[in-house]
């Protein structure tokens, strides 16, 4: 269908978002133009503010508006454990269960040989540097149960084992191919309680 140029551009912009197909992008575009000017301005202002004000924590790599982030500066956290996740959404999912009280490390991606993403392309070097001068005795790998998540998990385990650091993986309450951010709280709780050593 042929749309006026401004709508077509808006549809194109929405369709660049992950998980948004042509139909959803079209619905979002038409909904957006039906919003009041005030609501559209607020939406645009909030989008720009998030883009400008957020940064990655210099310690853990999590998206934050403070650097270092509130988790890294919390002295009540267990500093002997680091839970490694793919992205900041996974930190939020784990924090929701209120069971894990250690630190985090956000990789900002996964090793993906099929897509040409190697260990140097994700936030992995800073994890190794972080471990060298710390009291961490366990690294818990909480990558998604996908081929890339498994490849990343095995690589991290292989790199850290010689250093004598215990490396564990979340238990398999998570279905293969599932994303941590979509898992329910009970599944995440069981996965962390029953983690296995790699």
Curated annotation (Swiss-Prot):
Role summary: May play a role in DNA repair. It seems to be involved in an RecBC-independent recombinational process of DNA repair. It may act with RecF and RecO.
Family per similarity comment: Belongs to the RecR family.
Organism: Streptococcus thermophilus (strain ATCC BAA-250 / LMG 18311)
GO biological process: one example: DNA repair
Residue ranges of every copy of the Toprim domain listed in the record: 80-175
Keyword hit for DNA damage: yes
Protein name (Swiss-Prot/TrEMBL): Recombination protein RecR
GO molecular function per UniProt: DNA binding; zinc ion binding
Gene that specifies this protein: recR
Entries under SMART domains matching the protein: TOPRIM (SM00493)
ZnF region ranges: C4-type: 57-72
UniProt keywords, alphabetically: DNA damage, DNA recombination, DNA repair, Metal-binding, Zinc, Zinc-finger
């Amino acid at each position: 269908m042929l749309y006026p140029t401004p709508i077509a551009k808006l549809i194109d912009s929405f369709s660049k978002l992950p998980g948004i197909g042509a139909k959803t992008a079209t619905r979002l575009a038409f909904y957006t133009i039906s919003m009041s000017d005030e609501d559209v301005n607020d939406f645009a202002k909030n989008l720009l503010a998030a883009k400008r004000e957020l940064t990655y924590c210099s310690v853990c790599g999590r998206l934050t508006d403070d650097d270092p982030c509130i988790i890294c500066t919390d002295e009540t956290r267990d500093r002997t454990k680091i839970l490694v996740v793919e992205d900041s959404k996974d930190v939020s999912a784990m924090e929701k269960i209120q069971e894990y009280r250690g630190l985090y490390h956000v990789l900002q991606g996964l090793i993906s040989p099929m897509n040409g993403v190697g260990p140097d392309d994700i936030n992995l070097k800073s994890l190794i540097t972080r471990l060298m001068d710390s009291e961490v005795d366990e690294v818990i790998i909480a990558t998604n149960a996908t081929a890339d998540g498994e490849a990343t998990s095995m690589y991290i385990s292989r790199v850290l084992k010689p250093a004598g650091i215990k490396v564990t993986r979340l238990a398999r309450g998570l279905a293969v191919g599932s994303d941590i951010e979509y898992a329910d709280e009970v599944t995440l709780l069981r996965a962390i309680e029953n983690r296995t050593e790699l």
